[in-house]
Amino acid sequence: YENGTLKKETPYENGYIEGIVKEYHSNGNLATELPFSQNKQIAFGKHLEANGEATTSGSYKDPRDGIAYEWIKIGEQIWIAENMNYASASGSVCMQCNNWGRLYNKKNAEIACPESFKLPSEQDWKNLISSVGKDEGTKLKAGYGWDPLKGTADFGNGKDDFGFGAKAGGAHFAASDVEMSKRKFDDAGKKAYFWTTEGTVAVFHYDKPVMTIEKFNPEHGASVRCILK
């Protein structure tokens, strides 16, 4: 910086960025501490504001395929604020990959999250609800893309008060070995289904202000949101 404060420390080894890359705010306090290997960030690392408090939002690039995702801190949790779009072998499909992400069966949902993140448990979802308070569905749903409510001109869009942006991507109701032309995609615009580690799904509804936990066939496809370990 112009005031002489160190801005960044980047370790190199054999021509590659290798090790912990540190960036600093102009006041000298640590901004980020990110692990790198062969020029790629390989884990989430540490993110801090100039006053030393934890950063509440940012972007993280999946080291496996280079796709960048926005992340958000809600309460004491850090969530990836977009549906995962990691293209695992045969157990994931998508209708609008760039909008809704991919729909995963349970087996592939378990490997969908990038390094440093994991598939959330039912308790993780319940903790999220506790952090945002009553009418959690409305507060966490995206402000667009949800169907109109029956008999009204109003849409089931959320307020997205926390930047979580749950999108109504629906689900995939068929096993992975069923021909694509015979698979059933349903509930787009009406519901969002997100896997839990227990094999249930957290469901957001276009016509309800709450989020529910429901049973789901492990061979069928639901969206994935990831939480920091």
Across the structure, where does each feature detected by a protein language model lie?
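Glycine/tyrosine- and acidic-biased, solvent-exposed loop/turn segments at the edges of beta-strands
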Residues: 1-55
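Conserved positions within compact, well-structured domain cores
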Residues: 53-229
